[in-house]
Amino acid sequence: MGLSLTVKEPVGISCLEKSDKHCHFISRAREGDSFYIRREAISCPLARFYLGIENPNVKSLAKTLVGWDDSHDEDTAVRYLKSAPRLENCPGYIVYFPYPHENLKPDVIIRIGSPGDIMGLIQRFSCLTGARVEASLSGIGAACGECTAYPLATGKENVSLGCYGSRPGMGLNQGELLLAFPSGSRMVEVCALE
C-alpha cells in the first residue's frame, strides 16, 4: 500500500468522510480502494500522537496505554512514548492507495508478506546496498508508528510484527509481517525487481 501526506486537498480521488483508525484505512487500501481523508478523521489517540495530528498530553495518552494493557504503568508508558520517532506535524490530508498506482506517488510504502517474502526483500536490499535494516518494533502502534511515522521521521526502512490493533485492523493473517519504507529508499528498487 502507498500513503501520501499532503498539505493540498487531493483532486481526482474521493474523500472518505468518516472517522476511523489509521490501520483500518490502510486495510481499505489493501483491499484495492484509493481515497483520502482529512487528518482529523484519524480516531485512534496513539495514531494521532505518532502522525503528529495533535500535540497530546503525554500523561493522558500514557493512561490510555495502561488501560489497553500496552504498558505496565504510566511511567513506563511515558518512557515508551518519549522514545518513539513521530511526525511533528501531519499535513491536512492523508492519501491511502494500493501500490503501485499510476497516478499517485507515495511518501511511504507498506508491504505485507510472509517471513520468507520479507526476508527475501531485505536480503536483496542488503545485497544491493550493503546496509542492514535495523528494525524498531514494540508490538504497540504498529501501522501508525512503526510503519508510517518511523519511516517518514527517520528516512529508514522498518519491519513490524503488527500490534493488537493493526493485526485485526489490517486483516493480517497468521504469519504475515509488515515491511515499511520511505519512497526514497532503495527498497523501492528491490521491490520493482520482483
Where are these regions (language model features)?
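Acidic, serine/proline-rich low-complexity intrinsically disordered regions
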Residues: 1-194
